[in-house]
Amino acid sequence: MGKSYPTVSPDYQKAIEKAKRKLRGFIAEKKCAPLILRLAWHSAGTFDSKTKTGGPFGTIKHQAELAHGANNGLDIAVRLLEPIKEQFPIVSYADFYQLAGVVAVEITGGPEVPFHPGREDKPEPPPEGRLPDATKGSDHLRDVFGKAMGLSDQDIVALSGGHTIGAAHKERSGFEGPWTSNPLIFDNSYFTELLTGEKDGLLQLPSDKALLTDSVFRPLVEKYAADEDVFFADYAEAHLKLSELGFAEA
């Protein structure tokens, strides 16, 4: 399905470019790229393709959505970003959070994800329970990413590779530890570690291990472990799709 992007004013475009520069410096300095990427993902990942509700429209700044169990700790991200957002009142929260997610990938060495401005903020947070549950397997991943969001099997595996940065925190998800030995570098090590098997100090969630036992997912894991360029290309495409769920639909 093609996209029909809204036209934004030159002033808006200029504000986006300036905000991007500010975000680059800030996220690098605070070493908070994983948290900011999680904010962008969790904001977008609530989209339901049947009802056309949820999605990347800024609602995650509301306390009601931050209170969802899957969003534990994201109030920190919202708080961290607010002083920068205040410098750009013209920019919607919807655009700002997705822009921050794109920057988080880029400054940790990941691919450049295209960004199109023009999302409008929506007033109503989505209901709880739309985000993936890390304790579940491949059927659940397909229900959430495929049926609800409309993403492909390839998108699911590529997006899982976003766990190359960051760590799980017991007080947020019940799990503890990083997925890779360098959690501030975006590379294909999530997949190489997954294929190597469990290691002391590194995390593999049930939803990660599910990628190895599924006949469609596993070959993609192997492909990405063998070729980082292929992973980067597919990741950029999947991240773009996720960041535009329900936005600019032609």
Swiss-Prot record:
Pfam families linked: peroxidase
Superkingdom in the source lineage: Eukaryota
Biased composition (Basic and acidic residues): 117-137
The species this protein was found in: Pisum sativum (Garden pea)
A single GO BP: cellular response to oxidative stress
GO cellular component, one term: chloroplast
InterPro entries: Ccp1-like (IPR044831), Haem_peroxidase (IPR002016), Haem_peroxidase_sf (IPR010255), Peroxidase_I (IPR002207), Peroxidases_AS (IPR019794), Peroxidases_heam-ligand_BS (IPR019793)
Taxonomic lineage: Eukaryota, Viridiplantae, Streptophyta, Embryophyta, Tracheophyta
Stated name of the protein: L-ascorbate peroxidase, cytosolic
